Amino acid sequence: MAAFVRLLERLGWAARAQQVVEQEVEEECSVPGASGSLLAAPRCWQRLHRGAAATSGLRFGASAVQGWRARMEDAHCARLALPGLPSGWAFFAVLDGHGGARAARFGARHLPGYVLGELGPAPQEPDGVRQALRSAFLQADAQLSALWPRGDPGGSTAVALLVSPRFLYLAHCGDSRALLSRSGSVAFCTEDHRPHRPRERERIHDAGGTVRRRRVEGSLAVSRALGDFAYKQAPGRPPELQLVSAEPEVAALARQDEDEFVLLASDGVWDALSGADLAGLVTSRLRLGLDLELLCAQLLDTCLCKGSLDNMTCMVVCFPGAPRPCEEAISKEMALDEALSHKVAELYASAQEPPGLNTVFRTLASEDIPGLPPGGGLHSKAAVIAEAYSKLHQTPGECQEEEW
């Protein structure tokens, strides 16, 4: 772990420098109370979560990491069964707080209950369920408003998956995203709610607000969120027509046998990898037979190595049609890990002085190495490289550092 953290420190230096510049430029339009400060080293400990439902064939894994941020403001929830509904209904959500974790934690704790209350015992699919999800988000936001300390800033984006035996419902507000992989490719991906999108800009203007620097009132980067009640004060307008709205955009997708998985993630993940890259990386890890929570942990490690500075949470929900473990893929992965370890040893032995870990990584990055994981490339193998390096470059103090 210590070697991996040191590698992240080196690889993240340029990204952190750019972040400081951006903060200086945008200081006058930042959200009050926003937690933009960065740590000297990332906190890489990950919180893992997994579950499975034998009757429906659903299984999920999730992981969350604080990363470079001074505070952890993400939250998530998973309900593999919904009381009062038949087998096969399930609910999952990832929430990304800003200006504090209060809104994200509230949503993770209470949103499933509001969804269940709005669905009732006999949901009408798909239109009735879509409306139930909209109402549940708005009701949760109203209750959050009643409990919110007056004048406090902060809010949370959210992305949710509601599974029924016939449909997949993807509901989101803000820039936490979801994608569906079907037949080996991305079949659907949500679109971020940004103030410059025509529909969002029109609502903001109609509510008496402005969009400056691609932000609501020059400050908030998303146009839909739970919380952010300072932007929900336009008189005479319903909650869904305020400058910032908690009404989610809801897609209803008929289920198919070819459905493989849905990935839900906060924006720190999407900052580092595209939807196609994420789908390819998840697919390749599924073929290795990884437990889903460990798959998510590897994905977040890859994003950290690619320079993401945000809190990150990802959740993978697999359906019966998900890629299965493949002996050939497992053998190739083992051979790749062995080859990378051998290359690290060669670089170490050929240098006049012991090379730094960052030098080793960048040297390998300049080479054409076959068989690297699709989507993640060499960054998804940083832990393997760091482990091989640490075996060659251990110092007396390193053993203690490993326990950090």
Curated annotation (Swiss-Prot):
Gene Ontology MF, one: manganese ion binding
Obligatory cofactor(s): Mg(2+); Mn(2+)
Domain PPM-type phosphatase: 59-319
UniProt catalytic activity: O-phospho-L-seryl-[protein] + H2O = L-seryl-[protein] + phosphate; O-phospho-L-threonyl-[protein] + H2O = L-threonyl-[protein] + phosphate
Residues reported in the UniProt entry to bind Mn(2+) 2: 96, 267, 310
Record flagged with keyword Magnesium: yes
Family matches, as SUPFAM superfamilies: PP2C-like, Protein serine/threonine phosphatase 2C, C-terminal domain
UniProt cross-references to CDD domains, sorted A to Z: PP2Cc (cd00143)
Metal-binding among keywords: yes
Superkingdom in the source lineage: Eukaryota
Binding positions for Mn(2+) 1 per the UniProt entry: 96-97
Record text on cofactor binding: Binds 2 magnesium or manganese ions per subunit.
The EC number(s) this enzyme carries: 3.1.3.16
Key words of the record: Hydrolase, Magnesium, Manganese, Metal-binding, Protein phosphatase
Record-stated family: Belongs to the PP2C family.
Protein name in the entry: Probable protein phosphatase 1N
